[in-house]
Amino acid sequence: MNEFFKKISGLFVPPPESTVSVRGQGFQFKVPRGQTILESALHQGIAFPHDCKVGSCGTCKYKLISGRVNELTSSAMGLSGDLYQSGYRLGCQCIPKEDLEIELDTVLGQALVPIETSALISKQKRLAHDIVEMEVVPDKQIAFYPGQYADVECAECSAVRSYSFSAPPQPDGSLSFHVRLVPGGVFSGWLFGGDRTGATLTLRAPYGQFGLHESNATMVCVAGGTGLAPIKCVLQSMTQAQRERDVLLFFGARQQRDLYCLDEIEALQLDWGGRFELIPVLSEESSTSSWKGKRGMVTEYFKEYLTGQPYEGYLCGPPPMVDAAETELVRLGVARELVFADRFYNRPPC
C-alpha cells in the first residue's frame, strides 16, 4: 500500500523545469521548479512586462492558454474580475506545474541583463525636507535605460528597496537615486539617520519597463513625490541625445516644501529644443500661504493643457495618483496603450 501511495504522489511532483511558450511570438523560455514566471524571465534577461512584482499593479498579466500553475496569492487582486475569468493571471504570482502556453499583449525580447555588484555611497545631498539624493559608485559598471530602477540592499540595516535611477548614465559610472523618508522605513530611516558616506551597499540592476518610447507625440509627464526621479532621468537623457519633444510636466506635491529639483528642471527648460511647460500643483498648501501657483490635484488641470494634438502619458509616483492620471488621460482621448506608468509601492520592512 505504501508503495502505491509513493507512486501516486510522484505523479504530482512538478518537473525540474517547465517550458513557457509565448503564442504568436515563436518565443519560449525555461522556468526552474519553484520560480515564478516573472522571476525566471527577469533572471534570464527577458523583458517580461512588470512593475511592482508583488501582485498589485497587474502589469505582468498574461493569458494562460494551456497548462497548470500554482498561484502564490490570488491573481484576482491585481486584475479585474472579467480578466481573471477570461484566463488572465499574473506572472509574478504563478509557478508552473508543467509546460505552459501563454499569450502576452507585448512582444518579448532580450533586456539588459541585471548584474549584482557592491557599491560605496559617495555622496548624500538633501533635496527636500524628506528627500535625499544618494550617489553611489559601483564596483562594476551598470548599464541601464533611463527610467529603469535598481534593487538596493543594505546589510547594515537588513533591508532591500527599489529605487529608480535619477540621472542618466555618467562617464565615471556613478549612479544617483532619490530616497524619500518613509515613516518607520528601515532603509530610509537608516540613510537619514546620519552621514552614510563610505557605507557599502549591494546593487542588483537594471530592472523595469518604464522609459522613453519613440514618437513625435507631446509627452504628458506626471510625477508625484520621488516619481520625479525617473522622469527627470528620461528628460535629461533626451537632452543629451538631442531628441527633444514637446513636454508638459505636471509635478504633484502636498506643500511648497515638498517641491524639489526645480533648478534642474528649469535648466532643462532653458536648453530644451521645443515646448516645455512645468506645472507644479499643490494639494495641501495652506490657503494663507504665499503660493500663487495651482492648487488641488494634478488631474484637474489636464484639460486646460491638452488641446487636441497626439499625446503620450509618462506617469510615475504613488499608485492612487498614477491610477487617477491614467483614467483622466484616457477620458480625454489618450489611447490607454500610449500611457506608460511606473507605480511606486512601499515595500514592507524586510
Curated annotation (Swiss-Prot):
The keyword Membrane applies. Optimum pH is 8.5. Residues 109-350 are annotated as: Ferredoxin--NADH reductase. It is an enzyme of class 1 (oxidoreductase). PROSITE patterns: 2FE2S_FER_1, 2FE2S_FER_2, FAD_FR. Its cofactor is FAD; [2Fe-2S] cluster. Its EC number is 1.18.1.3. Residues 16-108 form the 2Fe-2S ferredoxin-type domain. GO terms for molecular function: 2 iron, 2 sulfur cluster binding; ferredoxin-NAD+ reductase activity; metal ion binding. Gene3D superfamilies: 3.10.20.30, Nucleotide-binding domain of ferredoxin-NADP reductase (FNR) module, Translation factors. Inactivated at temperatures greater than 40 degrees Celsius. SUPFAM superfamilies: 2Fe-2S ferredoxin-like (SSF54292), Ferredoxin reductase-like, C-terminal NADP-linked domain (SSF52343), Riboflavin synthase domain-like (SSF63380). The reductase activity is completely inhibited by quercetin (a common inhibitor of mammalian oxidoreductases) and p-chloromercuribenzoate, but not by iodoacetimide, N-ethylmaleimide and pyrrazole. Residues 114-213 form the FAD-binding FR-type domain. It is found in: Cell inner membrane. [2Fe-2S] cluster binds at C52, C57, C60, C92. One of its GO terms (biological process) is catabolic process. GO terms for cellular component: plasma membrane. Keywords: 2Fe-2S, Aromatic hydrocarbons catabolism, Cell inner membrane, Cell membrane, FAD, Flavoprotein, Iron, Iron-sulfur, Membrane, Metal-binding, NAD, Oxidoreductase, Plasmid. It is a peripheral membrane protein. Monomer. The xylene/toluene monooxygenase is composed of two subunits: the electron transfer component XylA and the hydroxylase component XylM. Component of a monooxygenase that catalyzes the first step in the degradation of xylenes and toluenes. XylA is responsible for the transport of electrons from the electron donor NADH to the terminal hydroxylase component, XylM. Belongs to the bacterial ring-hydroxylating dioxygenase ferredoxin reductase family. This is Xylene/toluene monooxygenase electron transfer component XylA.
